[in-house]
Structures are given as C-alpha cells and as structure tokens.
Amino acid sequence: MTLAPTFIARGLLAALMLIASPWANALVFAVNEGVTYRVPLEEVRGRYAAIAADLSKILKQPVTVEPVGDYNLLRRGLASKSYDLAMIHPAHVSIQAIKGSGYKLVAITKGYQKYTASFLVQPDSKLNSLADLKGLKLGAPDEDSITSWMVRATLRDAKLDPAQMSITYTRYQDAVPFFVENNLTQAGATAANALVKAWQTKGGKILAQSKPVPIKHILASPNLSADQIEKVREYLIGLDASDEGKKKLEPTKYTGFEKYDEAKMLELGAWLGL
C-alpha cells in the first residue's frame, strides 16, 4: 500500500515540531536519595517538582526530574554526562563525578554537612578502641553506601585493613543494631542519628566515630556554562530566605542549601580512598 503524500507530510511536520520543541532539549535533573532509604522513585519526582519548575524559568529551558535509585546507574549517567544537574546523596559518587567527569559542586544540603559514622558496641563490651576490632566481626550498611565508605576509611586510620576484616553488610542501616544486640557481630557502624540516639538511650556504647562528611550534594554538568551554574547556585542558596522558597523546600524535607569548597570535598575523597 502506498502512503498518501499528505499523510507523509503530516508525519514529517510532526517530527520537525518535536525536534523544535523545547522539551526535546530538556535538561535532566537526576535525584538520588541514597541506597539505604526506602523512598519510592515517583515520590522523589514529586518532591522536586516545584524546584524543577523554578529552574526551568531560570535556565530558560525545561528541567525534568529523573529519580535514580541505583548507584551504578547513577554513575553511568554521570560518566556519560547524561545529567545536567544532580542531587546526589553519597559523597563518594559526587566526588567520582567531580574528578572523573568534570562536574561542578553547586551546593550541599543544610543539616547534612557533618554526616558521621558511629561504631556501636554492647553496654558491657570490653572493646576500648577501633584497634580492638582486629579479628572480630563488624556490621555495616550496604557496601557501596557512603556510610560504609566512611567506615572503611576510619578503620584504615586505626591501622586496620578492611579487606582482612569480617564485615557483614546489610541493605538497611536499621539492621545494624540488631546484629550487635544479638551477638551476630561485636560492633556495628551506622550514620543514622535516630539509631545512634536509640542505642545510647538503651545504654549502648559508642566505641568511635568517623570524620564528618557532607552528603546530599547538588552537582552541575560541565555542559552548563559558568553563568548557568552560578544562577542555579544563587537560586538554591536563596530558597530558605523567603516563605515561598521554604514552601517549595517542604516536600524535599530539607531546610535549604549552602556553598561548600570543592577542594575540601576532594580532600575528603582522598581520605575515602578515591
């Protein structure tokens, strides 16, 4: 069957309109909320809708929110520069993108500047320092979580080789105290403040803590101009300065954003082993 010329012309016109549409050149704002948190991806999309709408106006280009739950998928997107903007929970993935793909640190999230891993032990534990963990079992969150990257760096600071230790990794941080309580491990590491407080309330001890590391970073692709990046930074940092901005922040559950020295971030990357 031969297609009518009019039908073909309409098809070509539709294709040309799609190419010319601003949505064909939409900027992608990837959002990752961490590997150990149970947040549905569609819920993540809704949380950032108002901010994405503002960014569309500021950059004069549509901005679409793309939730990314898997770290390896996130890494691939950053490596290929598929994401123009990215909200990244784990510091190690951010640092890898800055070092390897030329991304720029735009801002970090207030309230998450000093993310710290705590090593939990039983109230009657005879352990006095991290060095005492040699030859013992340690519970920790997902192996690729920022918490576990921090845990391994802290163990190295204590002259312990993580590769030669018995570390039991678990998908969720709230399983770590269970390991210690039930003597499945002699210590457990978590960076969840609620878990640490609950542990101490029950009489549990904190054996040691890691260096603090800021998490939940906003990065910008090298495909964006310096002017565009600065506009995004000014917008994000100024969000909590007005009632309207605070309202837009509410769905994200964050209080605001602030600047952070990219060089300091890279120094932390060296400590993490990147």
Task: Please describe what each predicted stretch is.
Residues 27-94:
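Extracytoplasmic small-molecule ligand-binding "clamshell" domains
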Residues 65-76, 165-178, 213-214:
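Short helix-initiation/N-cap motifs at beta->coil->alpha
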Residues 90-100, 152-153, 157, 178-209:
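A ligand-binding cleft/hinge motif common to bilobed small-molecule-binding domains
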